[in-house]
């Protein structure tokens, strides 16, 4: 593997520079004096930001983008061996690193690199940890998998030994990372186009946890199935967190978690508050500016780590009040004719369930969910779970499956989910065309309704288009 000397800036080219992680890494290198160029299939706000920094951008991937003055090429997992730039790199014998290996080498430059992992909640928790450390004057470098308004983007360049990295398990990419501290939020079946089964996923997370050094800290949710096995044979310090449903349960299980939430309440807009306990003793009342019990757990994970690393409770509380959410995480887009339009990235049944349960505490008449399934593999693997989760909405509109990296196998469609929802008495519609979905919603949504566009594809454009009408 090619090893980078970060004291000697070179020319690095990124294939797929518009990706949320790749763009941040490109900006980080540019800030450190490296010559950076990159290509992407299409233009975007992220690409335009890089262009304005002075980074050379190519729209469209072509062999001529690969020149002999390039010293290293970094590429995403989505880039295949038949990619024209990939082939040109091999022809020129230029060293290559995939994004995960490259990021792993970057993390080695920071004594306190932090990896935030889990099937769900990574972006939110990474953002919460980041704001806590910013408020606590840790001056961290931050790489988050979404747009965080508080740092005006997805990357923040600090000048300390602290580096916060969202760490995804897909294709075992986080096993190339080198964290000193880590969070494991949850472990569920996901990315079954790569992992064999849930046991394969559990093994991957255990391997990730074993990468932590003796002086490191692993924060792990105590509600993970068989979490005791997850923390076996670890040399690092292990910190657990969880939520109690009542004071009686907490009193009977004081030693279950190192950090715990109890007496969770919500205001008229669904924003959560709770009592924080540390080692069984009351610490403070925590107020969040986001909705949902899943965000109580996300905030607990962030608190557990930052408090352990020396953050003050005043800074932690102030940061949580400042966190209004990340782009595409229950993001309030606007109001049209009294209809509140929200967008959410949820694309796994557990995420859909958490979002719709949280939405129920938000002021509304009917909850409309416009769902775009993401990948054929995921839709087939969790078909019945999708039906159960989506049934929590009052009315459901299903768009076509967003293929992403996959070919259509021809044996699964959004129409199949609609049929299952109709069987259980739900009001569900399948509409393939986005323009027709918009027309349908304008005709059927009424004043006081909550409209949620949901999915990891381009379904967000429906709400944005409606608000322009």
UniProtKB/Swiss-Prot annotation:
GO terms, biological process: cell division; cell wall organization; peptidoglycan biosynthetic process; regulation of cell shape
GO cellular component: cytoplasm
Sites where the protein binds ATP: 118-124
Keyword Cell wall biogenesis/degradation: yes
GO molecular function, one term: UDP-N-acetylmuramate-L-alanine ligase activity
Keyword Cell wall biogenesis/degradation carried by entry: yes
Origin superkingdom: Bacteria
Pathway(s): Cell wall biogenesis; peptidoglycan biosynthesis
Keywords for the protein's UniProt record, in alphabetical order: ATP-binding, Cell cycle, Cell division, Cell shape, Cell wall biogenesis/degradation, Cytoplasm, Ligase, Nucleotide-binding, Peptidoglycan synthesis
InterPro entries reported for this sequence: Mur-like_cat_sf, Mur_ligase_C, Mur_ligase_C_dom_sf, Mur_ligase_cen, Mur_ligase_N, MurCDEF_pg_biosynth, UDP-N-AcMur_Ala_ligase_MurC
Localization in the cell: Cytoplasm
Its EC number(s): 6.3.2.8
Reaction(s) this enzyme catalyzes, per UniProt: UDP-N-acetyl-alpha-D-muramate + L-alanine + ATP = UDP-N-acetyl-alpha-D-muramoyl-L-alanine + ADP + phosphate + H(+)
Any Pfam family: Mur_ligase
Family: Belongs to the MurCDEF family.
PANTHER family, alphabetized: UDP-N-ACETYLMURAMATE--L-ALANINE LIGASE (PTHR43445:SF3), UDP-N-ACETYLMURAMATE--L-ALANINE LIGASE-RELATED (PTHR43445)
Function summary: Cell wall formation.
The protein's name: UDP-N-acetylmuramate--L-alanine ligase
